[in-house]
Regions:
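Non-cysteine beta-strand/loop elements that form the S-adenosyl-L-methionine
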Residues: 32-33, 114-124
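Acidic (Asp/Glu)-rich catalytic clusters
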Residues: 83-89, 105-117
Length: 127
């Protein structure tokens, strides 16, 4: 799509007007979905590793850019779900979630997660 150009010999306007007529870069919005971690915290919701894989596949097919899969140290089932999702070869970035404790971070690395949201509470009770 081309924009009309101002003929500066006929019309004088400020630079902001000229910039408004220039083609603008296309803006994109990325989606970070937390259903597999945060969604499972709702009362009565328990998802099997296979169900989490199906949800991750559906999110990927829907074009979600980043899927937060959870904390591998929360349970063996969560760790297994993360492994299944990583092995599925999805286009979306797969992100873990972890406390800032060394063992928790090492569990992310051991599974092969390349990115994570790291919770860093300031309360001694939560550390």
């Amino acid at each position: 799509m081309s924009s009309p150009q101002l003929d500066r010999s006929k019309v004088w306007t400020g630079d902001l007007n000229a910039r408004a007529l220039e083609p603008q870069p296309r803006l994109t919005v990325g989606l970070h979905d937390t259903t597999l971690r945060d969604g499972e915290q709702a009362a009565g919701v328990v998802l099997s590793p296979e169900a989490k894989l199906r949800i991750a596949q559906a999110l990927d097919e829907a074009g979600v850019d980043r899927i937060e899969v959870g904390d591998p140290r929360a349970s063996d089932e969560d760790s297994n779900a993360i492994r299944l999702i990583l092995e599925a070869g999805l286009r979306a970035e797969i992100w873990g979630f972890s406390r800032s404790a060394r063992a928790d971070l090492e569990a992310l690395v051991e599974l092969g997660l390349r990115s994570a949201v790291v919770d860093a509470p300031i309360s001694d009770v939560l550390l």
